[in-house]
A protein has these predicted regions:
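Internal, Lys/Arg-enriched amphipathic helical interaction segments that engage polyanionic partners
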Residues: 1-32, 37
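Terminal alpha-helical segments
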Residues: 1-2, 10, 55, 123, ...
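Short, charged/polar, low-complexity loop and linker segments
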Residues: 20-28, 84-89, 117
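Short, hydrophobic, well-ordered secondary-structure elements
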Residues: 23-27, 34-55, 133-137, 141
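Secondary-structure edge/capping motif, primarily at the C-terminal ends of alpha-helices
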Residues: 26-33, 56, 115-119, 147
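Alpha-helix capping/termination and helix-coil
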Residues: 46-57, 78-82, 115, 147
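Short, charged amphipathic alpha-helical segments flanked by flexible coils
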Residues: 58-97
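Charge-enriched, short contiguous segments at helix-coil
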Residues: 93-151
């Protein structure tokens, strides 16, 4: 079976509309005071986008749930590593993406509704939750663009 057929028929499409919808739902959660749910959605935005970018390359995601490992797989598949021949400002932006992934993963593990933490739960302000959602949305759109431009 040709890869295009498999992709078309078996992979749910992650596109800008999907990302926008999930982001809007996360912002609604913030407006309603459900900050931990918004953090979980910000992680989902990244995880879904990373998995989709990996799958359209015909690969299996390495470890669903660990967005750090998924992002590493995306970087490897799309050659998104810092490069001495690339503009240094672009390299700085690419290195900043690492921090976004790591920070959102940590917020999810310590400040969302995805795990029971009891008194160890980290409390965040609504503006921190907005930062997480907006950061994950921007990064997801970037990864989506990279994956679409490499077809």
């Amino acid at each position: 079976m040709p890869l295009d057929f498999v992709l078309l028929h078996y992979i749910n499409v992650v596109n800008r509309d999907y990302i926008k919808d999930l982001s809007e739902r996360a912002m609604k959660d913030i407006d309603e005071g459900n900050l931990d749910s918004a953090i979980t959605k910000s992680t989902t935005i990244l995880e879904e986008t990373f998995c989709y970018a990996i799958e359209i390359k015909g690969e299996e995601p390495s470890d669903n749930g660990d967005i750090g490992k998924l992002y590493k797989q995306v970087k490897d598949l799309y050659s998104m590593h810092a490069n001495k021949d690339m503009d240094k400002r672009v390299n700085k932006l690419l290195s900043g993406l690492e921090n976004i992934v790591q920070s959102i993963a940590e917020m999810r593990n310590n400040g969302s509704d995805s795990h029971g933490l009891g008194s160890k739960r980290v409390n965040i302000a609504d503006y921190h939750a907005r930062l997480a959602v907006n950061s994950s949305t921007t990064m997801a759109e970037f990864i989506l663009s990279v994956s679409q431009n490499s077809k």
